[in-house]
Amino acid sequence: MSCRIDFTWDDEASVWIATSKDVPGLILESGSFDALIERVRYAVPELLELNSKPNKIVDLTFVSERHDQVVVYG
């Protein structure tokens, strides 16, 4: 089984948000990207178990997105 985990930076709240269409109920946030990955690694098995998914090894693919702006002086 493979699950895609999407990470999006919320500039207004200054946190990373993790969601997944493959893992119902997964919505986590953290100011630290690394800490959020660890939280996701613990939450995914629990959520899949709650959603009656059979026990097996799950491949996690992490996809991050962050938009930023810079000023170009010319």
Could you describe each region identified by the protein language model?
Residues M1-D6, D34-G74:
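Short, charged, surface-exposed hinge/linker loops at domain edges
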Residues C3, D22-P24:
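Short amphipathic alpha-helical segments
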Residues T8-K21:
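Short aromatic-glycine-(Arg/Gly/Cys) micro-motifs in beta-strand/loop hairpins
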Residues I17-T19, E29, R39-Y42:
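Residues within well-formed alpha-helices
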Residues P24-A35:
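A short, exposed loop/beta-hairpin motif centered on an aromatic-Gly-Thr core
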